[in-house]
Amino acid sequence: MQTIKVRGVSGLLAYRVLARTVNTALLILVLLMAAATAARAEPVTIVVLGDSLTAGYGLDADDAFPARLQVALAADGVDAVVINAGVSGDTSAGGLSRLVWSMGDAPDLAIIELGANDALRGLAPDATYENLSAILQWLDDQRIPGLLAGMLAPPNMGEDYGRAFNAIFPALAVNHGVPLYPFFLAGVIGEPRLLQDDGMHPTPEGVELIAAGILPFVVQALGAVVVN
């Protein structure tokens, strides 16, 4: 009888230890899940590295592309902070020179909108390609997802230049494996009501159209980071 009693007590103690272990494990699991949920609840961060088309030349800050993209994302159920890293007049070389500090603490996505001023100045397409390639390579090295916004050369630059320049962006997208929004000014350029008096920079209505056009590409590029 004594042996049976000892075994019963031992079994009870073992059960209590097991129960405490399971409860502790469950508590840890709940805490981890809560932490993960809180982390996912944080807004995603997007940096737009660009020129005056990003900076919002001639516009109020709330009408600039990054601000309107943030509003468009929110309307689509994506909680995001879109940072304006645009500098008017900037070229691909200028964007490369300020790349590291512009990216800050590794955003969830970097949108690269550069090249328009390269074309307007007639800079060598090969140089533009190399600068943008270096930007995309750095993003890849830092494991920052990128989205490339394409640009087209103005017709007055001539067919040869236009052919060489326009081929830059599809080639970069293929060679670096990044998504491409083919033409940043799609639906806006050539539409006077959507352009400022200079015929180059979009009005607030033009920016709204740009944000709406690129929105699906941004959401797709964010991928698993986005929690609706």
Regions found by a protein language model. Give the residues of each.
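N-terminal secretory signal peptides that target proteins for export/translocation
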Residues: M1-R20
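Alpha-helical cap/lid subdomain in secreted, periplasmic
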Residues: V78, G94-N228
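Acidic-and-aromatic substrate-binding clefts and catalytic sites of carbohydrate-active enzymes
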Residues: G89-A93
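Bacterial N-terminal signal peptides
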Residues: T21-A35
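Serine-esterase "nucleophile elbow" of acetyl-processing enzymes
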Residues: R40-S88, R98-A106
